[in-house]
Amino acid sequence: MSARVGVITFPGTLDDVDAARAVTLAGGEAVSLWHGDADLKGVDAVIVPGGFSYGDYLRCGAIARFAPVMGKVVQAAQGGMPVLGICNGFQVLCEAGLLPGALTRNEGLHFICRDEWLKVEATSTAWTSRYESGAEILVPLKSGEGRYQASENVLDELEGEGRVVFRYVGDNPNGSQRGIAGISSANGRVVGLMPHPEHATEALTGPSDDGLGMFYSVLDSVISA
């Protein structure tokens, strides 16, 4: 059985091809989803990839969350479908209310593009089951608005419920509160992170193949469901 993973393309999306390739490398079938699609074509999971959807006008992800396809993604996520938001996709998921908090301008007010070490904090999500808790992975980070912020109550809730999925190791590149690089929904089916695992799937072209574990994980989750 091959799981079908939808990869959304908005105007301004940059990383849909890389996300689709990561799905294929993990053994899944990547299905293209257009922002105007009124259905999800029977996919088992969805990836909202990185880029600059709608030119980042208003706020990053603020317009994309109103795209027809996102209405279907929200419904599917509420029904338990695994959804991953990467970089701009993380911003979209926050705007859509699937994840708490917001991503704001980096603390240094500059675009960051470099490889970053992340610590895997939670392995019970649909997207991280292949990792060991406490493992450190190397993946690229490229964003200008990647600073995760939320109220202290929300941050305490995320920490207390084990929903901080990834944390930056060493220095905090963008000033994210508590060094948070990625979080999950309460049921662990929806995950958002700012760094790019899809760019770390082949050692030849990336800093590592550490990101591939996320795509293996969701295929495991879908097949075992």
Swiss-Prot record:
List, alphabetically, the InterPro entries matched. Class_I_gatase-like, PRibForGlyAmidine_synth_PurQ
Say which domain of life the source belongs to. Bacteria
Biological process terms in GO annotation: 'de novo' IMP biosynthetic process
Among SUPFAM superfamilies, the record links this protein to:
Class I glutamine amidotransferase-like
A molecular function GO annotation: phosphoribosylformylglycinamidine synthase activity
The UniProt record lists the Glutamine amidotransferase type-1 domain at 4-225
- Pfam families xrefs: GATase_5
Per the Swiss-Prot or TrEMBL record, the active site comprises 87, 196, 198
Q: Does the keyword Ligase apply?
A: yes
Q: Which reaction(s) does the protein catalyse, per the Swiss-Prot or TrEMBL entry? A: N(2)-formyl-N(1)-(5-phospho-beta-D-ribosyl)glycinamide + L-glutamine + ATP + H2O = 2-formamido-N(1)-(5-O-phospho-beta-D-ribosyl)acetamidine + L-glutamate + ADP + phosphate + H(+); L-glutamine + H2O = L-glutamate + NH4(+)
- Where found? Cytoplasm
Q: Which residues form the signal peptide?
A: none
Which GO CC annotations does the UniProt entry carry? Answer: cytoplasm
Q: Which UniProt keywords apply?
A: ATP-binding, Cytoplasm, Glutamine amidotransferase, Hydrolase, Ligase, Nucleotide-binding, Purine biosynthesis
Pathway(s) served: Purine metabolism; IMP biosynthesis via de novo pathway; 5-amino-1-(5-phospho-D-ribosyl)imidazole from N(2)-formyl-N(1)-(5-phospho-D-ribosyl)glycinamide: step 1/2
Give the EC number(s) under which this enzyme is classified. 6.3.5.3, 3.5.1.2
Q: What does this protein do?
A: Part of the phosphoribosylformylglycinamidine synthase complex involved in the purines biosynthetic pathway. Catalyzes the ATP-dependent conversion of formylglycinamide ribonucleotide (FGAR) and glutamine to yield formylglycinamidine ribonucleotide (FGAM) and glutamate. The FGAM synthase complex is composed of three subunits. PurQ produces an ammonia molecule by converting glutamine to glutamate. PurL transfers the ammonia molecule to FGAR to form FGAM in an ATP-dependent manner.
How the protein assembles, per its UniProt entry?
Answer: Part of the FGAM synthase complex composed of 1 PurL, 1 PurQ and 2 PurS subunits.
Which HAMAP family does the entry mention? PurQ (MF_00421)
Q: Which NCBIfam families match?
A: FGAM_synth_I, PRK03619.1
Name of the protein: Phosphoribosylformylglycinamidine synthase subunit PurQ
Q: Which organism is it from?
A: Rhodococcus jostii (strain RHA1)
Name the gene: purQ
